[in-house]
Every structure is written in structure tokens, then in C-alpha cells.
Amino acid sequence: MKINKIYSLLFLLGISIFITSCSDSLSDTTDGRLRYWISTLSSDEFEGRAPGTEGGQLTKNFISKTFQDFNLDPIDDSYFLDVPASEITLKDSSYLTLSFRGNDRKMITGDEVVFWTKQARDYRKIRDSDVVFVGYGIVAPEYNWNDYEGVDVKGKTVVILINDPGFATGKLRLFNGRSMTYYGRWTYKFEEAARQGAAAAIIVHEEEPAAYPWSVVENSWQGPQLDLQRDDLGADRVILEGWIRDSTLNDVLNFTGFNYDSLKEIALEKTFSAFPLRGLTLSSEIHNKVRYLQSHNIAAVKKGISNPDEYILFMAHWDHLGEIDSAQPSEDSIMNGAVDNATGVAAILEFAKRFSEVETDRSIMFLAVTLEESGLLGSEYFAKYPPIDLANIVAGFNYDGILPTGLTNDMVVVGYGASELEDLLENELARSGRYVNPDPNPEKGYFYRSDHISFAKRGVPVLYSDGGFDLVAGGKEAGFLIEEEYRVDAYHGVADEYDESWDLEGLNQSIDVIFNISNDLANSQQWPNWYDGNEFKSIRDASREGK
């Protein structure tokens, strides 16, 4: 134990020396700085930037030291804002069994199912819980939709389809057509199952509506699972959360008289009502190792001159997934997260440098949040317990996973059609003959899958731009190919690594555009708002009333 502590101290001392020496030789060019920050943050030395690890500590130290080098002010007395977390690791002795009238099938973890618990206890058990199919598992009064109406699922296991009904039909009158709503997110489905009193919630993975392959599920939800520390130890969550492959579910359903395709069809019927898959039960024993840790959001401010209590916010998440426990010694085990999200952190560090060199009327805040990969928890904690009045944030700009595409003719707005920030972006792009490209993949629900949503649902206007897809060299076809290859081959895997051949001109382009917009906002009296009819506008209006 003492040897391990000494090693850790020496490791962190070496980190400090490394950070100090490197920061003294920062490049004079944007491209050079971006390459340095991305390559460093995604290097093996940072161990995949998992919270609660030495690599995570190195990441936090690196970002805070960079803020310090730019003479930015901390919030209160420290750049580090506490985010108390729990880490729950499933032990190998845990199991999940699906049974049909006495015939047991012990599921193969990783290949067939992935499961965990967010209840911070050493041991949890479910015995012979009846399995109920609840369609999309949605209660949405505004869409006149309630999958749980008329059914009692207390103590039972619910099987849930991913995404929402609009995706399956493409009909705009059904939810938002192919564009995913928040009701399509896995986070919502687990939350709603808990509100309904279910003991277990299993989401069916199908690649197209999920927007990622099964490998992402394997890498994201196996190993230590992080959550915010809760006074009730997570008692308000279901006991078991998990995913099951669509093909695996289909095999299990053979005994019940249903198949996966028939369930999907039934779930779309206007008269759909949740129903038990008679004879099918779930049993599970969950053995956990529970550890409590203090993670951190890293925040810095460049104070404004005349309106220092009004803020322009730049955000990016610093965490990634760490290492794969199951990797063989000869295999690469580090999920470096170069695109996701060393690129985003590099972007806000570049904004920090630029704004450190100018004076603005309003303050500029730079926020690197933790626990994004665990469900946007760091940004949620900041927004729930804000160190500043969120109503005084003029606008937020989120950077998350910028692909190295090179120069583009466009900038993609994820969640297009939301706020007046898009008008500012369109005007700025038009000056150089470029254009705004609406989200080409609205069915993937990216707008609800990044940290800006923690601020949006509290009324703060945010812009989430995903670079561009219409490449100067190669057009849209080349841009979409880069996105598809990354999503399938690298996202949430060991292949997400920095390459010196990356063309970062597209990221540089984006930073230039957003800097111009944000600098104008920082020296104006403008208060951009959500468009009329947007779900967040009334929240913003109420928060600004009387100010």
C-alpha cells in the first residue's frame, strides 16, 4: 500500500513538471496549439481521462494550469469545482438470467447483454421478476402518449425500445418525425422506468435507432459506472439497468409467441398498451464494489469591464472512458478519446487564450466538465448548483467531438431551428460565403446527448455546432464518409487516437467564427433568446423576468 502511494506521488510530481515545461513553449499558431493540446490530452500518459484515476487527475491539472497560464480568474478560490461521485463496479460473480417457464438462460455479459446498477450498495438481488413489454417506455402528455397507462410495473422488469415512435414512422405528426426527442434517450427511459416503480429496465439495442453499434454499449457500460453521490444511495433508481442485443431478445422471444419485429409493430399502434411477456421472468444477483470519489468541473473566468456579472459561456467535457479491463496484455486497452473530446477541450483552451488577450464588457467563462460519459452528470451538477446565476449567462457554446475534416463550406448546427444564436452564426458565415447546415442526423438525437442540454433545459440559449460536412476538398460525400467511419470504427473505442496527419483547419475555422460572434456578444447589450415555440423559451423568459 505504501509503495503504491509513493508511486502515485511520484507520478503526480512528474505530471506537474511535465505540464510546467510544456506550457512554457506554447506554439505561436492556432494549429500548433490545437495539435499540442489534442495530442497531449489524448496521449497514453493520460490513460483515457477517466474520472477518479491518475489520468483523470493529470487532465484536471493540465487544464487548470493552462487557465492559470492565461491569467484567468477561478470561480471563488479554485479552478476546481467539486462534483461528488460514486463509482460502482460490477463483480464477476454477478449474473442475469432470463427464464421461460422454468427454462433458464444465463445471459452472456458483453456478447448478449450489458447490465449494472446505480444503487450504491454492495449487493442487490431480483428474483423471478415478470417481464413486461412497455413499447418505447414514454410518458409524454404533450404528444398524447403514455406507454405505461393502465399497467402496474412495480417490482417488474420492463423491456423498452430505443429512440421514439417518430423515428420508426418518419411521420412529423408523431413526436418530431425522424428527429429524436428527449423521450428517445436512454437516460430518460431509465428515469421513467424508475418513476413507474420497475425493478429492472432493459433497453433493446438496435444500431440504427440507437445511432451506434453494440461495441459502444460494451465499452461504455462495462467496467466502473459513475454517478453523482446521492443521499438515498440511488434508491430512487431501478435495481438493474441494462441493454440487450436485438438479436438476443429475438432468440428469447421465440418461446413467447412473439418476435422482435412484431413487438416493434405493436408498439406503434394507437391502441398500444403495455403487456406482460407471459411466462418470461428475470432473475439477477448484482455484486458491487462501491467507491466514493471527488471529481471536478474545471472553471475559469475572464472578468468583464462594465458588466462582469453577465457571462458568455464556453464548455467542453474533459472526461473519457479510461481503459478496457478485459483487454489482453498485448492489446491496446486505452480509449484515448482524441476526437471525443480532446478536440473540444482544445477548442475552449484556444478561446481562453484569445479572450485572455482582449478586454470585453461582459465576462467570459470557460468550463471543462466531468462525467459527461456517465450521463452528462458534471454539467448537470453545475447547472443544479450553479456558482453564478444561470439567468445571467447570455449564451453558451458547446464543443464536443469535432472531426478533423479540413476546411468546410458549412457549419452544422445540432438541433437546428432552436435559437437566435443561429441567426448570428448565419450572418457571420455569410461574410465569407459559407452557410449553416441543419443537423444532417437529427434521428441520432445529438442535441440531447451533450452537456449544453443541462443549461438549455434551464433556459440558457446554447449553440452546439458540429463543425461541417460539406468539405472544400471532397464535398458532402467525403464529409459524411469521415463521420461514418469515426462512428463505426473509433467512437468510444481504442481507435479514437490522435494522428499527426489530421487536418485541423476546419476546427480552426469554427473557432474563428465563434470567436467573432461571442466577442460581439461580449461587447453588446444583446440577449439572444430561443425562437418562439421552442420548448425552452418560456423557461428563459421566466428566468429573465425583472432583470
Where are the regions that the model predicts?
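Bacterial N-terminal signal peptides
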Residues: L9-F18
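N-terminal hydrophobic or amphipathic helices/low-complexity stretches enriched
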Residues: C22-P74, A85, Y95, D251, ...
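Noncatalytic luminal/extracellular "stalk/propeptide" segments of secretory-pathway proteins
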Residues: E47-L172, P276-R278, S295
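Soluble metallo-hydrolase cores and metallopeptidase-like ectodomains found primarily
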Residues: S99-R101, V114-G150, D232-G337, K353, ...
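Metal-dependent peptidase/peptidase-like ectodomains
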Residues: M107-D111, R124, E149, G155, ...
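Extracellular/luminal Protease-associated
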Residues: T109-D232, R237-V238, S333-N336, P440-N441
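Acidic/histidine-rich catalytic neighborhood of metal-dependent amide-processing enzymes
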Residues: G177-R178, Y182-G184, E208-P209, G322-E420, ...
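His/Asp/Glu-rich mid-to-C-terminal helical/loop segments that flank catalytic regions of hydrolases
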Residues: A346, K353, E357, G467, ...
